[in-house]
Amino acid sequence: RDPEMSRGLGDVYKRQEVISFLISAVMFWFDKYHIDGMRIGAVSSMLYLDYGKKDGEWVPNRFGGNENLEAIDFIKRLNKAVHMYHPSALTFAEENTSWPKLTLPIEEGGLGFDYKWNMGWMNDTLHYMSLDPLWRPFNHDNLTFSFFYAFSERFILPISHDEVAHGKGSLISKMPGDYDSKFAGVRTFITYMYAHPGKKLVFMGCEIGQFDEWDSDSGIQWDLLKFEKHNALYLSLIHI
């Protein structure tokens, strides 16, 4: 666990002035910039008081549990406000535990998100596709396990920005084999994604076979489309 992601915001969820500021800031983006959705990252660090912490570094809630009750209330209030004033807007949760009912409506006991990122599917599938084909038959559980929980939430299948940066390599560079095999691997990965239950989220650059990692300070290398393999990949994904 990333220590920075594990800290959350501590006790600030108990302060109403902070809650008001956070919700107002989000609503500003919807009202003034007309965004159509938002993703909340590291939701697990908000939901659990002990997330990423050792014994003695956290205090149980008033019921003796590890749930952050104030953060849960904040998430519900935020989702309620967004959907009340912008009914067509979507909210997404990046949450890497099995916290239940993330995408159920608040009135049904859920947290009110529209979708949850399926991080388990992403990690398992990327691991499988990165293996040499010789070893894939021994790792088919990476492809089948996600079906055990595929309908427990409203999932979106992501290629996270974190998985194509920070030294992890771009999507096509994760694929084994020679030059042609890497392009075939990306086509297979995307085809499997589109056949799997859940909404789809292809990260920028993956659709053209960009070998360089994503860099927030530079644009996508669209000039790659002048090369046959990259252009063929781009067109094949459109057909998919």
Predicted regions and their residues:
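Single conserved hydrophobic/aromatic residue that forms the stacking wall/gate
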Residues: D2-Y13, I238-H239
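Soluble or luminal CAZymes and related metallo-dependent hydrolases
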Residues: K14-L22, E67-F74, S181-G185, A232-S236
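An active-site-proximal structural segment forming one wall of the substrate-binding cleft
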Residues: R15-M38
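Conserved alpha/beta catalytic core and glycan-binding cleft of carbohydrate-active enzymes
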Residues: H34-D36, Y51-S218
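Aromatic- and carboxylate-lined catalytic core of secreted/periplasmic carbohydrate-active enzymes
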Residues: K76-K80, H86-P87, L224-I238
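Aromatic-rich peripheral "rim/lid" segments of glycoside hydrolase catalytic domains that contact
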Residues: D215-F227
